[in-house]
Amino acid sequence: MAEPLAVDPTGLSAAAAKLAGLVFPQPPAPIAVSGTDSVVAAINETMPSIESLVSDGLPGVKAALTRTASNMNAAADVYAKTDQSLGTSLSQYAFGSSGEGLAGVASVGGQPSQATQLLSTPVSQVTTQLGETAAELAPRVVAKVPQLVQLAPHAVQMSQNASPIAQTISQTAQQAAQSAQGGSGPMPAQLASAEKPATEQAEPVHEVTNDDQGDQGDVQPAEVVAAARDEGAGASPGQQPGGGVPAQAMDTGAGARPAASPLAAPVDPSTPAPSTTTTL
């Protein structure tokens, strides 16, 4: 069976008085040794550090003991007063008569109102402190509000400037995604050669205009005339025109062509015959 908790305020007060009445001896005088050898020098160097532990720590120990004794006296006083108040409260609820019992019940009913008053006091203090704090912060809030109002248009303008950029980025991303899904993009541009202009490289080889064909037709009859002239110069007198050559060899007709030399280029039949009249 556990023993009931009991505190003896009288014994506690007596122990506190005894602790406070302790008398500590006076610390000895510093030790100093005369001499010049190494032992004397070592003693004079070591002893001050040992003596300082006592001389410096003793006042702190005395102060701690005095404080402990004072706390013990205060605790004994609290225990004594608490015991007295509890005895007085219990004596009010003694059931010696019916009137005393009813009075005790009435007193019990009145305790909640007292407790309410005790609880309401700290709450009112907290409310007052909150009101004072709010009053102190009010000027700062009022000072910050105009700054926020001035910064609001800048924030709206920044958001408006940022929206086109976001749209451009989204469009670029969509185009890149479509190109990736298509699998093939446009052919890359080729660099033009440094030796030929780009116009000559772009022109196909197989394309020949009608003007070029006409030029070729004009050149071929000139070559034929030159070859015939060379043959006439190297032939015998009997074979030159008018020198015994048969008439049918001279007169080939108005629309006939002169005989072509074996060295001359072949003549296209579809090409019209040019005039053979030359000026010497």
Swiss-Prot record:
Residue ranges crossing the lipid bilayer per the database entry: none
Residue ranges of coiled coil: none
Signal peptide positions (record): none
Subcellular location: Secreted
Originating organism: Mycobacterium tuberculosis (strain CDC 1551 / Oshkosh)
Region listing for Disordered, in residue ranges: 167-280
Function: Could be involved in regulation of growth and intracellular survival.
Primary subcellular site in the record, as a coarse category: secreted
Keywords: Phosphoprotein, Secreted, Virulence
Keyword Secreted (UniProt): yes
Annotated protein name in UniProt: ESX-1 secretion-associated protein EspJ
Origin superkingdom: Bacteria
Residues bearing PTM Phosphoserine: 70
